[in-house]
Amino acid sequence: PWGLRVEAESPLTVLTVVRGDVWIVPDDGRPLCLRPGDVALTHGSGHYTVADDPATRPDILILPGQRCYSRDGQAPEAPLSQGVRTWGNDPDGTSVMLVGAYEAMSEVSDRLLRALPPVLSLAADEWDCALVPVLCQEVVKDDPGQTAVLDRLLDLVLVAFLRAWFARPDAGAPGWYTAQADPIVGRALRLMQTNPAHPWTLESLAREASVSRASFA
């Protein structure tokens, strides 16, 4: 049995299961079972437990800054490092997962995350993402520039997850997100995002979108 008590309060954490079953048990929510290929996203300051079973008592506490302690607040009794960016009590264990945490988010990202529940997940057949195997291969490497490689891969996994999530009919995607798919409004939004310093007006946006001002308004 194994369990992690997560009180890191990272703005955003992405967890993908590689092997075995993993349970996420939020303090204020229902337990969530993840199987190989499933992915979960947590955000905000909520605390939760990650374990092999909802009833397993956590033996490791993770605090802000990814600081790890045993259940009694002491340093873990046994070294938990299993190699490059690999952490746990058994490299051949029955449960293996990839975890990436964002420690800072932009205002735009925060606006997007406010549209999401605190904990959400997608099953493997809901988001066929070819990036996860690549991330599995890259995370154990220690080559020059590897941090930049992993950061970009994690960004891509996050974008793929959010696209798949908001494509669900029950996702409740915010209006500004769905507007991106509109051929006229979406083009205008992209223009303003690309050049926010430009003094855009209804007339100039309508002209760039190849529609009349009345149609655009």
Language-model segments: which ranges?
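Basic/polar phosphate-binding segments, predominantly the helix-turn-helix DNA-binding elements
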Residues: 156, 160-166, 181-182, 187-217
